[in-house]
Amino acid sequence: MPQVIFETEDWSTMVFLFTNINEPNHNGKAMTRAAFREYIARQNVTDCSKPINVHWNKSDTHTFAVVACSSEKIGVDIEYMKKRPFEKISRRYFHEHEVTDDMEIFFDLWCQKEAYTKWKKERIAENMRVKIDRPLIPLENLPDNVVGYLCT
């Protein structure tokens, strides 16, 4: 059963966390179906309602995954923070004003840019230097050393 780590008041957008995804029973399709079941169960549907239009996006890192479901276009990213050559990577992918060797700043920027790019439905490599012009929601209730953002 996935854990809800974000939901709007009207349940039009929800983010589900899956842990221990390296176990055999945690495959991508099963996780997505479980998130859809939970999301659809909370939607206000009557006998006369049209089929629910679900936009979704998922991300995984280390042994964790999130699936975001929404009635609107959505992008999500999570990253497990670990030591890397941050300055070298940020020089390659980020705008020159965003170059950093700080792990938390690097992963915050990376997750924001990846969530935004997924929301735009574009290639990540082509969009890491762009300025984000949408509100981003930091995901809370994530495991230690995991950072994540949602773009709606």
Q: Which residues make up each language-model segment?
A:
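Core catalytic alpha/beta fold that binds nucleotide/phospho-ligands
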Residues: 1-152
